[in-house]
A protein has these predicted regions:
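Extended, regular secondary-structure scaffolds
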Residues: 122-239
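A broad, structural surface signal
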Residues: 116-119, 127, 138, 257, ...
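Cysteine-centered metal-binding/redox modules
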Residues: 432-512
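Extended, helix-rich architectural segments
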Residues: 1-157
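Short, well-structured alpha-helical interface segments that form or flank functional binding sites
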Residues: 128, 254, 314, 318-321, ...
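C-terminal helix-loop subdomains that flank or include functional centers
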Residues: 299-302, 317-318, 325-433
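Extended, charged amphipathic alpha-helical segments
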Residues: 214-354
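Charge-rich, acidic-biased intrinsically disordered regions
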Residues: 8-18, 25, 36, 49, ...
């Protein structure tokens, strides 16, 4: 084999990709453009082309058609709930480590905090179905961890979409665990080519390819000290193919594309209605615009007089109805009908609650995936630091999704119907909770209706074991005190305290 053939083979191997990548690449590009919108989507040329339509006419129609980007809207809704509360992290052996503190502030050495980085992970895994995270540490030649700390060297993260990862291979170990044994991705695009990184459990190879001149500029191989490939596949939802996830917008993107084409038809319909086509002979001179003058030859046959071409296409209202049906279908697919609604919808309380529960289940599943990915990241981070990860990461597992306006209206109706003062107190408590306020018993310390000795039960001087919860005047149903006719806290105490016998306590427990 000649040297030229050898070089060509090396370049082809460096730029090659596996079967899964080749099969999914076109779909991934479509999902990426559907999420990004703007010029990315216009460059995809997703409008259906008319017969005999010229390139110039097609481009003009693309640039005049707006895109309703439902893909980005759905992903943003998911992230707004998923990261409403910050995850809780316990670092175990890495607690108070300067490297970890620096890592939390700047996870990718590009200014993004770990929380911001994980938001991007959630975004791209939602778009593509999965994304890849590399945990890497620069090789500066430092001998000890102390030397690395002096130089400020620590592990950092590199987020890659599936479009950048061109080849990967899994192998089942003797213990039955699947391990990543080959991982190749495009690290950087250069003016003349690209830089490719190839990881194996033993080596790290960096290849810089000059595609214009068909040559390899750099081929550097170094040892992989970890003994495994520090890559994390963050799934949105696992598919039947290892290393491939299920996107949240894979079906939404198709409906979005249909809406995009309907928008084009609506725009064309409005143009035709406003500016209908004029049929005339070549000799007839007609101006353009409202009130234009038409000059006909003197000897023109009356049967050849100019006339307006009638348009018998679909009605505008019919196209708008189809578009609205597609939007409702998108909301059903994403379980965001009550969240993204822009107008009041007639839904029963059960239907709305069911929709919220489905969205809550979807968000909980996404949170579990984020927990798993982040714990794998910290496990690799700890290996780089010469220790084992003993901490844990916890994302919110339940998302309190309620229709505040509908619940408030229900409570208002209940209060107008009720006659029992005790029920009034329960409704007032529910209203305060709905508004995000603390329950009255938690902040009520003294009112005109309570004695001055109304104090927390752990206050010095209060008899041990005495509190409002075990007082005979206390009603646990509405947290009311029949002695003072006030709402009280079960962990407070006053001088009017009177104990109740165990039978009374047990009966009240059974009643409540």
């Amino acid at each position: 084999m000649s040297i030229i053939q050898t070089i060509d083979q090396q370049i082809a191997e460096a730029l090659s990709s596996n079967t899964e990548y080749n099969d999914y690449r076109e779909r991934w590009e479509y999902l990426f453009q559907s999420y990004m919108g703007g010029m990315e989507y216009k460059d995809g040329r997703y409008l259906t082309r008319y017969q005999l339509e010229t390139d110039a006419e097609y481009r003009a129609r693309i640039y005049s058609t707006p895109l309703d980007n439902h893909c980005a809207s759905v992903v943003q809704v998911y992230n707004s709930f998923l990261f409403r509360e910050q995850p809780e992290r316990e670092f175990g052996t890495l607690d108070n480590s300067p490297a970890v503190l620096s890592f939390l502030r700047d996870a990718d050495l590009d200014g993004r905090s770990l929380n911001s980085f994980m938001k991007d992970v959630a975004t791209w895994s939602s778009v593509f179905g999965h994304c890849w995270i590399m945990v890497v540490k620069p090789n500066t030649g430092a001998v000890t961890l102390a030397d690395e700390q002096v130089l400020g060297v620590r592990p950092y993260l590199n987020l890659m979409t599936p479009l950048a990862v061109t080849d990967w291979r899994w192998k089942r170990s003797v213990t039955g665990v699947y391990e990543l044994v080959y991982f190749k991705y495009v690290e950087e695009f250069t003016p003349s080519g690209q830089t490719v990184k190839v990881w194996t459990p033993d080596t790290i190879q960096t290849i810089e390819v000059d595609q214009k001149n068909n040559r390899i500029l750099t081929d550097l191989t170094e040892q992989n000290g970890l003994g495994y490939i520090p890559a994390v596949c963050a799934y949105n939802l696992r598919s039947s193919v290892r290393g491939i996830g299920v996107s949240d917008i894979t079906d939404i993107a198709d409906s979005q594309r249909m809406i995009y084409n309907i928008n084009s038809e609506i725009e064309q319909s409005i143009r035709i209605d406003s500016h209908p086509s004029l049929v005339k002979t070549p000799e007839t001179q007609a101006g353009i615009g409202a009130g234009s003058i038409i000059q006909m030859p003197d000897n023109l046959d009356p049967g050849l007089r100019p006339y307006i071409l009638d348009y018998n296409g679909a009605e505008l209202s019919a196209m708008l109805a189809v578009k609205q049906n597609l939007v409702e279908a998108i909301d059903k697919m994403a379980n965001t009908g009550a969240i993204r609604a822009t107008e009041a919808r007639t839904l029963s309380g059960v239907a709305m609650q069911t929709e919220f529960q489905l969205l809550n289940a979807r968000l909980s599943s996404k949170a579990d995936g984020m927990e798993l990915a982040e714990e794998q990241i910290f496990s690799m981070f700890a290996n780089y630091m010469g220790t084992e990860w003993t901490g844990h990461v916890e994302y919110p597992g339940s998302f309190n999704i309620r229709d505040t306006e509908n619940n408030m209206q229900t409570l208002k109706t209940a209060k107008e119907t009720a006659t029992d003062p005790g029920v009034y107190k329960v409704i007032d408590y529910e209203i305060l909770e709905l508004l995000g306020k603390e329950e009255p018993a938690k902040y009520l310390t003294n009112t005109d209706g309570l004695p001055g000795a109304y104090v927390p039960a752990d206050t010095p001087g209060v008899p041990a074991g005495e509190n409002c919860a075990n007082c005979s005047y206390y009603n646990p149903f509405d947290q009311g005190c029949s002695k003072w006719d006030e709402t009280v806290s079960p962990v407070y105490w006053c001088r009017a305290w009177e104990g109740r016998i165990e039978e009374e306590i047990e009966n009240m427990r059974e009643d409540t």
